[in-house]
């Protein structure tokens, strides 16, 4: 082999070695960046109390009028995003900033199907009546969104280990819907209703009044209901019995 040829081969070998060294440095730099990013994610997760929840949406209504309208005017992607948004909003209303303050829920399923009623939540599943979607006159997407906020509240709220009155449970769910600005026009106006625990929109309006007396009242009430329920919670938080508060509420609005 000639001297010139040997020099060329040696230069090629050296250039190859240099390229390998450069690639190793690049890989080390990328690995370092990944470690930094992972560390940042872990830090942020610890700071903000990230809780991983899986959301699943299924349309079992097929080619029925409600199933078709759901597909055309609402859709699975929007429904899934609404479940996520509703969860974040509910945690905010309940002032639950860490996973320790919340229910442990790994998966929430939304099922669109033909059934009776409007919707219900059970065992971390939300069932919505496709017939209701199909026959609703008006902005069905807004109505559907409000229903999801109500039902998602049932997934996340505390119920006093089954001791909380049903009217209060439903009232808190509608209170969340009210604060999310998805209250429909047919709801009662403030001050209307016969009993504080009448439920739904009546109790939601009353809770809104109570929350105006003490900002964060509903969040504190929900926290107290983690392990049980007592009507004394109203006295502890607002200094009056719930019946006194109801009387004051009715008087404020001339009812």
Which residue stretches match the model-derived regions?
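N-terminal low-structure segments adjacent to metalloprotease catalytic domains
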Residues: 2-72, 255
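Pan-zinc metallopeptidase signature
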Residues: 31-37, 43-58, 197-204, 209-255
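Sec-exported extracytoplasmic/periplasmic mature domains
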Residues: 91-99, 153-162, 174-182, 208-215, ...
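Second-shell loop/turn segments in exported
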Residues: 69-80, 131-143, 158-164, 192-195
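Post-HExxH zinc-binding segment in Zn-dependent metallohydrolases
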Residues: 86, 97, 162-205
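Stable alpha-helical elements in mature extracytoplasmic
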Residues: 79-86, 90, 140, 144, ...
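Auxiliary, metal-adjacent structural segments of Zn-dependent hydrolase domains
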Residues: 53, 61-131
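Active-site scaffold of zinc-dependent metalloenzymes
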Residues: 109-159
């Amino acid at each position: 082999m000639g001297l010139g040829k040997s020099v060329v081969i040696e230069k090629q070998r050296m250039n190859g070695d240099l390229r390998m060294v450069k690639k190793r440095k690049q890989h080390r730099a990328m690995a370092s960046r990944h470690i930094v990013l992972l560390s940042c994610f872990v830090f942020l997760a610890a700071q903000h109390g990230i809780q991983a929840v899986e959301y699943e949406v299924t349309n079992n209504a097929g080619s029925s009028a409600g199933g078709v309208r759901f597909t055309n005017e609402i859709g699975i992607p929007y429904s899934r995003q609404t479940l996520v948004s509703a969860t974040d909003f509910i945690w905010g209303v309940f002032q639950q900033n860490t996973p320790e303050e919340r229910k442990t829920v790994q998966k929430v399923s939304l099922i669109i199907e033909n059934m009776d009623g409007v919707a219900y939540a059970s065992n971390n599943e939300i069932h919505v009546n496709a017939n209701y979607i199909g026959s609703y006159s008006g902005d069905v997407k807004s109505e559907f969104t409000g229903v999801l906020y109500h039902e998602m509240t049932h997934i996340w709220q505390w119920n006093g280990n089954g001791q909380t009155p049903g009217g209060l449970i439903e009232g808190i769910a509608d209170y969340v819907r009210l604060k999310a600005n998805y209250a429909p026009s047919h709801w009662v106006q403030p001050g209307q209703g016969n009993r504080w625990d009448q439920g739904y929109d009546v109790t939601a309006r009353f809770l809104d009044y109570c929350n105006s007396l003490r900002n964060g009242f509903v969040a504190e009430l929900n926290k107290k209901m983690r392990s049980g329920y007592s009507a004394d919670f109203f006295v502890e938080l607002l200094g009056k019995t719930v019946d006194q508060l109801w009387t004051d509420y009715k008087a404020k609005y001339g009812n």
